[in-house]
């Protein structure tokens, strides 16, 4: 430590505030891996073992209450830089292998033994799960699938009461008929988001939901019904605004008690509209 207690760290490059428009939404990992060490303080570069440098850290700060950011979204922003900055804080400037090699090899690692908060299924882009029929109350092989994904199924509609679920997991619910207006939609982290669409009794349709870390898109019979991307919300008589995020890690664990007929369920670990 310095005698003047002027221990320092630089946060701008390693500080996340999700969708705020200031600081980072996602860290610039290629730059951090190639150029950054805890010895970089603003434009100054200290000796790697300078006594005033106690170590390194990075942070995510959720400044905006009600912006729709989920626990899964926070984890999605943290896990990858946790790997990158762990290397940099351990090795400093001497990383040993190029970033491209590091980025490829780390994809083979799990988050931790028995941990899959990113809800990754499979190692390459492919169809990862399918069922010919989804029976009410049945369970699946996976609790959920994370970004990026496509879930599709055929449905023959029947009368459904409000609050009828298609699937649920410990983290989210996807509704055939949401509890408020009876529309298709989803709930997670205390937020309810609904599409301008409902399956009417007797209607036959092919439903497709695509999700990534920015949006959730509903297609019916191949046509986009709604792309729930980042939405601008205004408050304080329009003087202030905030970005609102409508993402979903799609629940698969248990089917709801629906009356409709659901067939040809297919789950892909990529967005099929963005090959």
Where are these regions (language model features)?
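Short tryptophan-centered beta-strand motifs in secreted/extracellular beta-sheet-rich domains
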Residues: 151-153, 203-220
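Single conserved hydrophobic/aromatic residue that forms the stacking wall/gate
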Residues: 1-9
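Carbohydrate-binding surfaces of carbohydrate-active enzymes
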Residues: 68, 80-147, 157-158
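Short, aromatic/His-centered strand-loop micro-motif at the edge of beta-sheets
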Residues: 185-206
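Substrate-binding cleft of secreted/luminal carbohydrate-active enzymes
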Residues: 37-104
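Extracellular glycan-recognition modules
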Residues: 126-186, 262, 267-274
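Polar, glycine-rich mid-to-C-terminal structural blocks
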Residues: 11-28
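Flexible glycan-contacting loops in extracellular carbohydrate-active proteins
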Residues: 225-263
